[in-house]
Every structure is written in C-alpha cells, then in structure tokens.
Amino acid sequence: MSAKAVAAAVALSFGISAEAQNSTSSPYSMYGLGIYSPKEDVAAAGLGHSGIALAPSEWLNISNPAGISKLDSLSFYFNVNLKGFYSHEESGYESASVYSGNIDGISLGFRGRKWLSFAIGYAPFTSVGYKIYQEKTITGSGEKYKVEYSGSGGLSQAYFDAAFTLFKHWSIGGNFSVLWGTIERLEVNYFSSANGGEDIYNKTKYQANNIYWEVGTQFDFNIGKNNFRFGATYAPEMWLHTSYDQTIYNNVSRELESDDSTPFRFHVPRMYGVGLTYQRNKVLGTIECKIAEWSKVEDNKFRYTANFRDTYTVSGGIQYSPGSPDKPFYARMRYRIGYTYGRNYVDLYNCNLIEKGLTLGITVPIGRSLNAITIAYEHQKRGTQSAGLVEERISSFKIGFNVREIWFMKHKFE
C-alpha cells in the first residue's frame, strides 16, 4: 500500500469515527459513563482480550504502552479495526434482539530508534446505547401509560504511546490520551396513550473531556527453551470536566423548561493489571488479571444512579503459529482461542453482573506481503434475570486490516 493510500485511509477512518459511538445495546449502559471498551488490537481480542504481556513484532499491541517495544525497525504499521455485533436481551417478562456495527479503532506506529517506539491512534473509551420501555400507572385514575428510556453516545480517546527499551529484556511505556465525548439520555412519558394528554420529553445531554494517562512495563526472561514475558499496567484515578444541558418539552415541540448545569467532575477509577506470557516454538499462551476501583466513584450527578463495585477481569488465550513470516501462505496464518471472566461495575439489587466470553481469532496474510487481515469472534454473556434484571447474550465480530510496509530501508545504488 502506498503512502498516499495510507494517508487517505487515515483521513477516511477519522471521518467515520466521528459518527461511530454506539458500540453497545446494553441496558446497563444507562448508568455512569456506559460500557467500558478496552483499548486493544483485534489479535488481542481473539486471545480473550489479553495483551498486557504481549510484545509482538507483527502487529501493534496497544493494550500495554510497553507492548510496542519489539516493533520491526524497518516497518511502518497501520491498522483499521471494525466491529459488528448481535445482541439478544432477555428478562423474565420479554426479550429483544439488536444488531449494529461501527469502527472500533485506528492505530499507526513505528520504531524510531533501537530503544524507542511510537504509536498514535483513536479508540472508543466507553459506549452508551439502550432503549427500554416501561408501563406506569397514573395515580388516582388508574390509567396506564408507556415510558421510554433511551440513550446514545459515549467517550472516545485519541492517544499517543511511547515505549522505551531500557535493557535487552526490560521495557517501559507511557500512554497519553485526550478523552472527549457526548452522552444523550431521553425519557418520554406517553400520556397521550392514557388520557389524550401531552407527551412529555425530558432530554439531557452530557459533555465530558480531559486528559488521561497510563504507564506499563514488560520484562522478558527464559527458563531453558521456554520464553516468558511479564507485563503490568497502571492508570491513576482521573476526573472528567463534565456538564449537561437539560430540556423538557412536549409533543408539539413546545419547550416547557430548560437548565444548564454548573460544571462538575466525574471520576474515572484507578485501573491496574498484570499478565504473563509463555512461548515455546509455535505455541504462545497468555493470562492476565485487571482490576478497576469503581467502588470509589460516586454517581450522583447523572439522572439514573447506581452503586458501583470494583471490577475484576481474568482472561487468557493461546495462539498457534505454524511458521514464520517468510514461509508459505498457510504457514503464516495465526490461530487463537481465549476466554474472559469478570464482573461489571454496576451494582443493582446486590446482584453480581458477571461478564464472560469465549473468543476465537485468526490472522490471514495478504499475498506475499507483510499485510494481513485479522478476525476475532466472541460469544459473551452479561447480566442475570434475577431480581427482574436483563441477561444479554452477545455475538460480536471484529475485523482488523493490518498494513505493514517497509518504509525505512536504505537502498544502495551503484
């Protein structure tokens, strides 16, 4: 792919990303900032969303800022990731199905020096997308009317990663991100269906932004012919500059009330994780644990409030590589399988909202070049039908277009 083609793809992708926010249909996204989206490449998604202890030379590992330290010094890397999903949601009373898709991230990177690598990109940070109906009764008359709750939007991040190789087996990395986004929540009371009255719309638009940073490290060591890599990441508690505009109007577009809030702060929790990778010959295995201290975050500024719990996620995966990049087509394919298990941060009726999923992945090379297409599939279960809550079963696909071009080779002329 030529430099002009890469530049065009970057411009097109950033144009798409401005509209790509609804990466979920979960009713649990109505609380706080929505469903958290890990910053990762499609290859890591196929390994159960595990990337803290990975440092590949074939693709950009953005799960750990130190994970780009092993990039090829002659190559330029560029990735565009897309996502599509189908979600079936079921409670004890009814069920619904939703499908959607959008862009899931853009990244590019290169190795500037023997000891220094860079990556920049765009990725979703949180996603909001839900539509819920409820039936209520008018006090006194006993007439019933329908209420609709819906929301959309989320936060995005534009990031810059740098990885430093301090010694042969030890690297550190830093991530600097700008977070921004809009979350819209709408509540509609359909009084016209009960007594012919006016439908009342209550619309709230939240806007949030600030900087965000994360650090990471990786350390390689060998035991005989077995290769190991330890990885760790840490992101401190941050806060977002947040404000909202609220408008109440009826079904004839007549504004009844409006309110502009005083800016307030919403905290993003402290997050940290550790991972370990084992590799011997053609097989790689990785396992990791991530924790986020959501219990210290107060959610009293949003319309729909909930208690938050600390989250934990344990995940791992196995990759099989038949051959090296200079081998025939079939030998350059990569096969992955993974599993993830964790707890959502929303606490409703003292129920643990467990999230677990099985992942599969494959990388298919394009011709004789270093470019490839990476695909990851996940079947995930989130939530429970206990206490009148919703259980979600989600099938999602991610596809990544991985461009790796030799840009920095010096040619000799006679």
Features from the language model and the residues they span:
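Short N-terminal alpha-helical targeting/association segments
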Residues: A11-S13, P56
